């Protein structure tokens, strides 16, 4: 089963790229011209129209706003969103994004611009990357254009490509957060060896992130003792982070230290009583030692905390399955896929149906997960939830297909990191 331990790259990216101030929020009303005030009124009207999903009207307001103030970065971002929603011209969409990225803006405004990138189709993304490549050549010493390209690639789950662009940014300026992103992206690309090398390069000012990433990667590699030491390091650095104890609990389970795992999951709950996966995993540990009353209590608590599908993942389907409520497990999974049809959701669905013994649906959802970008191929082949399909010829065909795709993605990564700014 997929665990949700990845970095929130967009949020961190925007915090470390704070390159200006948002005009509509930080400029005093008395410091604006009448024209700028009118531009902001149109912008605010556009926001209201967008909330009503009237994107055509919002587009008209934003165009009027930009006529009055052509330096209004947030207006370009929202105009691009409106064009996406109304199936506007691809060239116009990507041009507006570039204009928004070129202008000085706050972290909040930058987040708006980057969020638009994540709404693009593959074709729109390719055009945006082409335009970002032009900006990279024009401003070869500005790391931000490579970082923007990384986010564009990440929006299409092109993990190798995103890692390559972040590496280009690091070559300009050794930003430790970008180095952490590289390690995390290479992990998601399924290349644990390169991911570990990247994690080891993270500077001492991010010692916690370095240790946490190493723990996750080493666990994926099956180096459980080393992974355990890495989680111990995380806890020594900051004893109040629930995720460190959760990761250590998962590792102790692999090492058959069930009592130790229970203690760690209990610590997670002490630190964060809303951590639903900790209740589920502790319930699993109680079940392994035959304490079914405690297990059921934890399962029910996990369900109480996971009443609706969430983008960051749900323990609920697996809890229902542990309680023997197969129909509810399936129904909840279906609701997740309806609302959040991303690669992680499909991978979890494949695991659920693997546990249910439904080979056809397990393979179908695994194929969907891979199609949407899931690339941890070695993990897939050793995941106990997928044992039921791992010997099927169709499974081997799918893995071979995406191994070839992954190899091509790796070649693209090498091409990016070895290219010159003038190329």
Q: Model features per residue range: what roles?
A:
Residues 22-63, 67-78, 84-91, 95, ...:
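N-terminal leader/linker segments that initiate helical-solenoid repeat arrays
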Residues 32, 39-40, 73-74, 107-109, ...:
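Helix-start (N-cap) detector for alpha-helical repeat units in TPR-like alpha-solenoids
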Residues 47, 81, 115-116, 151, ...:
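Residue-level recognition of tetratricopeptide repeat
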Residues 51-52, 85-86, 119-121, 155, ...:
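Register position in tetratricopeptide repeats
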Residues 65, 99-100, 134-135, 168-169, ...:
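Canonical positions in the second alpha-helix
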Residues 68, 103, 138, 171-172, ...:
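Structural marker of alpha-solenoid helical repeat scaffolds
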Residues 78, 112-113, 148, 181, ...:
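Canonical tetratricopeptide repeat
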